[in-house]
Amino acid sequence: MVSKDSGRCILTTPEREVEPAACLALEMRYALDPNRQIKKRNKALQVRFKDICEAQNEQRDTQLSSGPLGEKREAKAVSCRVAYRKYMTVPARRSIPNVTKSTGVQTSPDLRKCYQTFPLDRKKGSLKGLPAADAFKSQNNGFLADSKEKSEAGPMEEPRPCSAGRIHKTTALVFHSNEHVNALGQPSGVNCAELCKSPDVLGYPEAVLQNSRPPSEEPIHQLQGRAKLDRGTLDSEEPAPLTHGRVFKTEVATVYPPAISTRAPEPGLSNSAAASQWSLCPADEEQRRAAHLNGLQASTGSAVACSTPVQYLSPECSEQPLQNQPSPTAGIGDEEHQQIVPHTEVVDLKAQLQVMENLISSSQETIKVLLGVIQELEKGEAHREGLSYRTGQDTANCDTCRNSACIIYRYVNILFPLCYSE
């Protein structure tokens, strides 16, 4: 009998030990459930607030029933403070949501859509995010790609045969206006014997090329007759593309490095290496001859006439005749080049300053809005805790306020001298 009882006790003891362990595991799992915790916390908040209100009412009733009027008021204030202090010191106050972290309201517009940050985007295509770029359509600020230059030439121009090998230096600051066409290019060729068959490659007929002797070797009446003849042939052959203006080749040294020539270039050519090497239009021919006839520029020495068409040569052979060919429009090209380049640089600086001003003002407005939101949140928190809230930041009068602790004041002092220091 004893053995049976002891055996029964041995068997039943593990069962009794397993049951509390399973119950404890279930309770822990149930207690660690986040939804369960949130429900318990909300319930505790409701019960605690209800108990506090009932306690306040009980204290108020007991004090109103006995005692004079002044003591009643003082006791009422003390009871309210005690109850509020008790309510605020309970650890479950952590369940009150943090408004500054939980609210994801966007109080300011997205600045990326309105303004582009610096440095400017130099990808192929167009300038992104520069609102002032369209105001200066007549200037090429060096960031536009080859497609932009082709579109500026207009639909009048047909695709040219040798346009596959044209050399462009778009990142160099090449300035031209809307009526200038990008006819500055050279067809690709392997050796010097290859010539382009079509005379329309650079928009320059052979009649002008044969007349490339310097004006000093021709009489005046031949010059006038030849100018009329050139104008007539050009009007009959190409009426549309040659109505454009002068083409400048501004950075010759970086695009085409000069070859060592057998003959030294003339003094008139040395001053115009960066301005204009040759002219491509009948208006330029007329200007050249008019300048020579009026005595604006005297050609010194004898020039070497080009026997082969200079513009149809490959890039290897086209450098030497360029230096040997005289350029009577050197002084005029220099003047126009000096007039255009500083003007465009000033325009680009103005556009960049305008964009920076817009960016700074929008950022300042954003800071004002965010400061207002922060102040409202802090004021609400202070009123909930029974404190008085006072701030030294007056965002409504930012222009007149000079509070050194304000972030807007520091922001303006740091950024605006950067813009207007010059």
Curated annotation (Swiss-Prot):
GO-annotated cellular components: GABA-ergic synapse; postsynaptic density; postsynaptic specialization
Principal cellular location given in the protein's record: other
Coiled-coil residue windows: 344-370
Compositionally biased region (Basic and acidic residues): 146-160
Region (Disordered): 143-163
Sites of Phosphoserine modification: S177
Biological process according to GO: chemical synaptic transmission, postsynaptic; inhibitory postsynaptic potential
Highest taxon above the source species: Eukaryota
Quaternary structure, from the entry: Interacts with GPHN.
Cited function: Component of the protein machinery at the inhibitory synapses, probably acting as a scaffold. Inhibitory synapses dampen neuronal activity through postsynaptic hyperpolarization. This synaptic inhibition is fundamental for the functioning of the central nervous system, shaping and orchestrating the flow of information through neuronal networks to generate a precise neural code.
Record-stated family: Belongs to the INSYN2 family.
The protein, known as: Inhibitory synaptic factor 2A
Native source species: Mus musculus
